[in-house]
Amino acid sequence: MSTKKAIGDSFAAIFILLISQLIAQGIATAFGLIKVPSGVCNIIAGALYAGLAYVFLKAFAGKIVKLPMADLGMPEFAVKKRWILTAVLLPSLVKGSYLLAFSGPYVSSNMSGTQIFNTLSAGIAFTGIAAGFVEEMVFRGVILNVLKKKWNIKAAVIVPSILFGFVHIL
């Protein structure tokens, strides 16, 4: 693999991230136009973003990078019950510990139930789950492994980390 191809593949993976996000947001916006509640649209956008990115990256890995998804750090997907339990209990334990450890008045946001649902659905489904899922596939999956194949593990760890930081500054 040439340096040019490794760099090109890395930027193509970031482009796939952007395109997946734009398509997901566009489709979710279309649902909003037909009066689907905003909170539901946020969940749709998150699911579409993660799903589209996976499908596009899988096609990219097979056709362009010519590596199986497992070689890019993305083996067959399987969810174990203990991780579902951990995903539910961990935030609850952190929040509970916080409430027990720190005193003070509870301040209400005065938001309606709909506003709370809209805010939480965007924060959890899109920003919390989908964005993290896609960013890991792109930066720690495709980019890290393509650069590791071309150079070495040190460069493969440092370069995606810098790119990741740069993308978040934008």
For the regions a language model picked out, list residue spans one by one.
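Hydrophobic transmembrane-helix microenvironments that flank and shape a buried ionizable site
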Residues: 6, 18, 43, 131-133, ...
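Membrane-interface helix-cap regions at the ends of transmembrane helices
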Residues: 60, 104-107, 165-170
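Juxtamembrane helix-loop-helix connectors linking adjacent transmembrane helices
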Residues: 29-41, 66-137, 144-145, 149
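Membrane-interface helix/loop boundary segments of multi-pass membrane proteins
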Residues: 134-159, 163-166
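Aromatic-anchored segments of alpha-helical transmembrane domains
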Residues: 17-23, 92-97, 161-170
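Hydrophobic alpha-helical transmembrane segments
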Residues: 7-11, 15, 43-44, 81-88, ...
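N-terminal, membrane-interfacial amphipathic/helix-forming hydrophobic leader that caps
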Residues: 1-76
